[in-house]
Every structure is written in C-alpha cells, then in structure tokens.
Amino acid sequence: MVCGGFACSKNALCALNVVYMLVGLLLIGVAAWAKGLGLVSSIHIIGGVIAVGVFLLLIAVAGLVGAVNHHQVLLFFYMIILGLVFIFQFGISCSCLAINLSKQTDVINASWWVMSNKTRDELERSFDCCGLFNLTTLDQQDYAFCTAVCKSRSPTCQMCGEKFLKHSDEALKILGGVGLFFSFTEILGVWLAMRFRNQKDPRANPSAFL
C-alpha cells in the first residue's frame, strides 16, 4: 500500500501520539524526580510542569484512541485542541526568540521580587551568587542576608542578575527552538488527523459514510 493510504496515515498518527505520550510522561517524571531530590521546592513550578505533562498525555491518548478506532468525534476535537495549542506555543516560541537583553533584565527583576525568600535563597546557593543587580536599597539588603558559599570565600560575590542574564539568552533560544519544532509537529498532527478522518476505512461497510 502506498504511504498516502489509510493504513499509512493511521500508523503515522499513532506514532506521533506515542511520541507525545512519551514526552508527557517524561515531563511528569522529571518534575517528580526534581521534587524528590529537592532540586526545586516551589510547588508552583513543579505543579506547572506536571500539569503540562498531564495535558499533553491526555491529548496524546485522545489522538491515539481516535486513530486506532477511526473515531470521527475524537479526531475532530483532537484537531481543534492541537490547533489551539499550536497557536499558543508558536506565539510563545517566537516571543522567546525575539526578547532582547533589556526585556530579559526587566523580566528577571520583576520575577525576583515576587519570589519567596526561600526560593531566592535556593537560587543564590545554586548559582553561588548574592543579590540581583545591586541597584536599589532592597537589592543591597538582599545581598546582606545572602547565604551563598561565595561570601565565605571572598568579600564580594558576583551578582545573581549577571549570571541569570548570561544563561537566560541561551536558555530562551533553546526553549524557542524546541517550541518551534514541537509547533510544527503539532501542525503535522492536525494535518494527519484531518487527512485520516476523511479517509474511508477499507474494512468498514462499503455503504457506510466514512
């Protein structure tokens, strides 16, 4: 059978959804592992990653069941949801690639002061730095209460903002690139689901509609 046939479309859609399932399980597993080892204590971060993993897993299961059973309703909603996810993810990925250092500084500064003291302390110890940018009285107070190891080795520590900026540009490019890649796999999933949904099952009753 040629690759444009019913079986090929079905197998391709199943394979794509198996990949989505593995990615969803990986996200859930990594979040649980990070929480178990104490690498990340913020319940909001862990909960967000797990929620994304569960959401991706549910979409993949719906797509897989729809593909295996040639279920018209499931495939329709799968196409709609995956299309909406593509629009959202494509926009976020483009934003990650377009953000400049000035915007990154603003985002880091705003994020730093909405974090809990515990989260800031963990970041300072993890990156071995103290304070953010030392631009305000609050920054100086934050530096004074820092518990990073670098304070015991030298009279001054590198500011955390400098280290964050150094890594954030690379991280944003990686996130943007990975996001764009998955965005195009989602478009592929929508196209495969639409194509497969409109194909007639050769094993079905010849007089039945699709």
Curated annotation (Swiss-Prot):
Transmembrane segments: 13-33, 45-65, 73-93, 174-194
Domain of life: Eukaryota
Entry GO terms, CC: membrane
Positions on the Cytoplasmic side per record topology: 1-12, 66-72, 195-210
Protein's membrane topology: Multi-pass membrane protein
Glycan attachment sites: N100, N109, N117, N134
One matching Pfam family: Tetraspanin
Places the protein is found: Membrane
Residue ranges that the UniProt entry lists as topological domain Extracellular: 34-44, 94-173
Keywords: Glycoprotein, Membrane, Transmembrane, Transmembrane helix
Family, per entry: Belongs to the tetraspanin (TM4SF) family.
PANTHER family, A to Z: TETRASPANIN, TETRASPANIN-31
The name this protein goes by in its record: Tetraspanin-31
Taxonomic source organism: Bos taurus (Bovine)
Name of the gene encoding the protein in the UniProt record: TSPAN31
